[in-house]
Amino acid sequence: MEKSLVNRKKGDVIMDRILDTGSYGICLFSIEVLQDFLKKEKVRTKKILKNFQDNHNRYLASLENGIWIPFLSINSIEYIIKLENCNESFDDEWEEKFVYHDFNIEVKDSLWIADIGSFYEFDKNEFLGNEEVSYETLDGKTLYSGFRYSVSSGKYSVSIKGYVRKNKLDYPNSNFGFLFSLKKVNEFKGFNDPREDERYNFNVAKIV
């Protein structure tokens, strides 16, 4: 797949951003906010996901302070990603399957929506100065594991909606997607943990 997958104008056509989730999850974060938090917590390892898993209090603090938001577990497939703040939405060919509100995120200059595998061995240089993170498969197909969005600095309450295409299309078309919405707030009031499986089910590909 070429860069036409990225949300850029070609004439009057706006192409979709399609995210490959080889690691069964999506995360939202802002590079500078994340780096400041890791420095404050004296975290030097690049294995950020494992560090959060091994340090539950640090993980909860990261959610409370809007450092990142992990959305797990979802099928390891490609999803169409849209941000309502960029005037993006799913049309009537899609059916909304769920909506969850009130997750914290702090943004400085830009927001990344990426495959959670980015946090296995985090390399900030993959993101700095780039609009997307991509890689090529052995058969020459380009897949995208992260997209950058221009979002004003500040604190936000995040909502996530899951969508399914009403009439499934054949591969390589994506039949599932997520719509994110950011509402600016002055301060965070509490926080929600998206890993509370009894409360949340983000696996839109498995929702009937």
Model regions: which residues?
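Beta-strand residues in well-ordered beta-sheet regions across diverse protein folds
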Residues: 114-115, 159
